[in-house]
């Protein structure tokens, strides 16, 4: 006897399972089954496809008029941080630049101070609250970066918190050491601080899967970033890079040359960098909510990357300064509106390709897969990025069990 059958599904979304990320035109290929059925036993998928009455189960969910998809993957977050920066919004409205806000004691260094002052347990409670919000919105796989400690004690504190969260909730969660995220005030120079972070790599390897660096004007150069990435690979890390967010420094080209698993942001990436994606499996993780929040007009050139047969994914970039959202459904809508992605491209970018960007087996519904699913209160898969700003996730299913039920009920 099976444990659960989800039947009469209006649309069952079945992203293609591949060893490598979907590239170029492949991203627009999505198997959408009308009147579908999913059968689950022992937390695994037994069957997923067109409607069938050939299976029995102890529990049945009628998904008439609903969409069922794999649980979503958020491939770029800064989940563990102290404090918040809502007061900076008024400064931005007054026309203050990021550097001016930084000089006033705001910006990333204010988050560094707040994170340093927050105990590990309090940091855990805050991150747990934010993680549960992600789960309620359909996410069951997450990447979590450090980068707000900028010293040994506090970088480790951030990584320990994300590891505790993964253990408590048994999530597909990957942890990224982003020690070179900014340069703290106490550092004698960028170069000296970078060497401090490189020296930490063997120790943080016990808590982190990836090593990341912020390659940008005024932070770390291309040469410094390459040095760090090479040292990280020597220490056993797969590497990522925050690249070309503001200036076209060649961060995307560096990521491809160093065989990074992903290059993230890429708003200012050059045509040369986009062309190099053609022969690379590095995933371009695009973060359109960041561009929106910062009030910028130019978004990452998703269409140019796809035209060059590149692989792209989407993520929230959840952080307190430039993308204060942990709702990936909002990102899906922004990507459709501003990156000009089709509904199929959006869905693949938050499932199978996002999973490739953090090196996990997720984002598909195949026989033998973990039964990590979302039942959406939507008539079709195009409706979710179309009707933006609300939570369409009705039920979130983890390992075959309903762990979130957002069904509305009122007492009048």
Curated annotation (Swiss-Prot):
The keyword Ubl conjugation does not apply. Binds 1 zinc or iron ion per subunit. One of its GO terms (biological process) is L-histidine catabolic process to glutamate and formate. N-formimidoyl-L-glutamate binds at residues 148, 319, 321. Belongs to the metallo-dependent hydrolases superfamily. HutI family. It comes from Staphylococcus aureus (strain MRSA252). SUPFAM superfamilies: Composite domain of metallo-dependent hydrolases, Metallo-dependent hydrolases. This is Imidazolonepropionase.
């Amino acid at each position: 006897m099976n444990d659960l059958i989800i039947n009469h599904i209006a649309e069952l979304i079945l992203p293609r399972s591949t060893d490598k990320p979907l590239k170029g035109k492949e991203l627009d290929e999505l198997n959408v089954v009308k009147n579908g059925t999913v059968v689950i036993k022992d937390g695994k998928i037994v069957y997923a496809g067109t409607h069938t009455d050939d299976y029995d189960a102890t529990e049945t969910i009628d998904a008439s008029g609903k969409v069922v998809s794999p649980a979503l993957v958020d491939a770029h977050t800064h989940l563990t941080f102290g404090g918040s920066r809502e007061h900076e919004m008024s400064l931005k409205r007054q026309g203050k630049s990021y550097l001016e806000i930084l000089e006033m004691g705001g910006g990333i260094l204010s988050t560094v101070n707040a994170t340093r002052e927050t105990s590990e347990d309090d940091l855990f409670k805050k991150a747990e609250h934010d993680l549960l919000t992600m789960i309620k919105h359909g996410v069951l796989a997450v990447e979590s970066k450090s980068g707000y400690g900028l010293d040994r004690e506090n970088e480790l504190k951030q990584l320990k918190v994300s590891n505790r969260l993964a253990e408590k909730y048994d999530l597909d969660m990957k942890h990224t050491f982003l020690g070179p995220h900014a340069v703290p005030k106490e550092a004698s120079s960028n170069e000296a601080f970078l060497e401090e972070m490189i020296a930490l790599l063997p120790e943080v390897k016990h808590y982190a899967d990836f090593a990341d660096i912020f390659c940008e004007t005024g932070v770390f150069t291309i040469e410094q970033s390459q040095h760090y990435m090479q040292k990280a690979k020597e220490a056993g890390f797969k590497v990522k890079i925050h690249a070309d967010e503001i200036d076209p420094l060649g961060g995307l080209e560096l990521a491809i040359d160093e065989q990074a698993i992903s290059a993230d942001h890429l708003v200012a990436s050059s045509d040369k960098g986009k062309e190099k994606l053609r022969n690379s499996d590095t995933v371009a993780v695009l973060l359109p909510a960041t561009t929106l929040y910062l009030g910028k007009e130019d978004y990452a050139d998703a269409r140019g990357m796809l035209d060059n047969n590149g692989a792209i994914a989407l993520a929230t970039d959840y952080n307190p300064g430039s993308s204060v959202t942990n709702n990936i459904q909002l990102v899906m809508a922004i990507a459709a509106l501003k990156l000009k992605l089709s509904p199929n491209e959006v869905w693949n970018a938050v499932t199978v390709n996002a999973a490739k960007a953090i090196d996990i087996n997720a984002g598909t519904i195949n026989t033998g897969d973990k039964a990590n699913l979302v039942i959406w209160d939507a008539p079709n898969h195009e409706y979710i990025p179309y009707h933006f700003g609300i939570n369409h996730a009705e039920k979130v299913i983890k390992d075959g069990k309903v762990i979130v039920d957002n069904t509305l009920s009122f007492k009048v």
